[in-house]
């Protein structure tokens, strides 16, 4: 298992988790080609990153390059509808305690889907997840988003008309 993150502090938090000894951690800017071998992974997970990537075509080609032909790519991203509410990703840096609002890029759902297709990935499943009463019960701050889609999930598999060709 390999985990990649831009933030050294986030990687340090991950290294402290149970089972971390079995994980290879790589600090890397996801806007650049990954320093990993082609077709090295059965499953490629991309979690809450896409809204920080300006060039989706290049990024999805990289996800496709890393995935074995029989594997899958699973993507989670803040739902594009959240940008209509003025919501941008933000977090507290565990190393400094400072509030961080990384640069974001407003993409539409079709931007994500078409970049994946152009990269040679086929959509196998897509789901949208809205704030509900259970979420509000866990976090009262979510009440203002009740009923709004907050998360977009996609399962993609290699194949399709994309222009991907392994190097």
Language model features: what each stretch is:
Residues 104-127:
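Short alpha-helix
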Residues 139-167:
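Core SAM-dependent methyltransferase catalytic element
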Residues 72-103:
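Conserved class I S-adenosyl-L-methionine
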Residues 42-56:
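A short SAM/SAH-binding and catalytic strip from SAM-dependent methyltransferases
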Residues 3, 75-77, 125:
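Hydrophobic residues in well-ordered beta-strands that form the structural core
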Residues 57-72:
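A short glycine-rich, Lys/Arg-flanked "PGG" loop and its adjoining helix->strand segment in the class I
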Residues 1-33:
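Class I SAM-dependent methyltransferase SAM/SAH-binding core
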Residues 34-44:
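A short acidic, Gly/Pro-enriched loop at the edge of an enzyme's catalytic core
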